[in-house]
Each structure stands twice: as C-alpha cells, then as structure tokens.
Amino acid sequence: MDATKTAPIEIAKTKSLKQVIEINNLKKAFGQQEVLKNVSLQLYDGENLVVLGKSGSGKSVLIKCIVRLLNSDSGTINVLGEDVSSLKNDGISELRKKIGFLFQSGALYDSMTVKQNLEFPLKRIQKNLSQKEINEKVIDALEHVGLLNALNKMPSQLSGGMRKRISLARTIVVDPMIMLYDEPTTGLDPVTSDEISSLINEVQKNYKTSSLIITHDIECVRNTANRIIMLNDGEVYMEGSLEEFENSNDQLIKSFFK
C-alpha cells in the first residue's frame, strides 16, 4: 500500500451539498472559563472539514459536544437531521452508531487481540451478523489499513502508528456515515503521520464518509482538507480553502502556515 500518495477527493461547491452536521451559536464553559463562544459551522456530505487551532482553542471540546460526550451550554447541534441536545439516551446511542470516532489515544482494549477489538463494535452495533460476515468485515477493514497480518496480535505488540491504524480499522468496520478524528497524527513520526493522513483520504473515498478532522498538525491539514475552519480562543477565526489560508496575510494564520 502506497499510502502517502492518496489525496482528498474533489468536492463540489459545498453550498449545493447536503449538511450532515450543522452547529449554530454553540457555547460551552467550564466554570468561568468559556471554551466555545458562539461557534457556528457546517459539515457537508462527503467532505473532509479540518478544524484547526492551537492547543486550548476548543477543538476537542467541540467534537465531544457533537457526540454528547459533553453537553453544550447553549446553541444547537444537528447531526444527520437529529437535534443532538434533545435526544434521550437511546437516541444518542442510535446516533453514535452512525458516527466513527477516532480518539487521540487510539483507545484499543489491551486485553483483546486485534481481531477481537474489531469484532467488539460489530457485535454491539450490527447484532444480526453471522460470524462469517463479521470475519469478512474485520478482514476488509484491516486490509484497508494495511495490517491484515496483525489480526491475532495484542495491542502491546503494536507500534504507535500501528495502534492508530488498527483504531481506524475498528472505527470503519461498522461503516459509519460520519468520521470524527481527534488529533489523528499527534505523537507520530512524519512518515507515519503522512500514512494516517492518506488513510483518512482513503476512508473518505472508499467508505463515502463525511469527516471532521481536529488537528494542529499543518501537514495533516495540507494532506486532508477540502475546507478549513480555524478556531481561536473558542471562536471561529477564519473559514476557507487551503489556498486561502496559505495566501492569507493575517499574522495568526501566517504563524500556522509558515
């Protein structure tokens, strides 16, 4: 697999596309500290949207509010036609089945083999599958990330980059409609980071996902973004294409894209 050469697919003008996530005037504070201040954004069908910002800008809080790992203080979050804030526990569980979440840590179960890690969400979410169908889905997901040979390994036997790729395989094995990536390349060497970025693009192409990518890694931005939103101090600072960001004369933007 030559992962480093995979680019994000071309997306038509977003205004003509369906919104799969719509956020309006979102606020979230912890005590007196406002983390998100009137954040509004849209994720369109089939695109890779990168949310960029320095540490502490509210990026990870935003993504946790989307899947109700955190409750927002005010504003609205609409995901796949559902008002997230109004959903009861059963509704949230059903919505999360349609969303893949790649955690920064990878979050594999250390006591399970790679195969068992991938089987777990399938048995929980797609309960009518036969063992043969489960096996086929597991193999397909591992082939997509180039790690079929790790099928029977334990997480402790994997490198950091391999763990991240297995975590991605576990996320896509249930065929999510939306992918949420929380700092997917953090802690990885440049070569492995490029491979992960390329895999994000392959997931976009092969699984027809809409992806929201939280990062402060500029190379990840360059490799994956169809569109970029920059957060600064909990607010949307700029929205645009990679070209618009790289050509901006704004000093804060230039400090990221130097």
Residues covered by each model-derived region:
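A short, proline-enriched helix->beta-strand linker immediately N-terminal to the Walker B motif
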Residues: 173-177
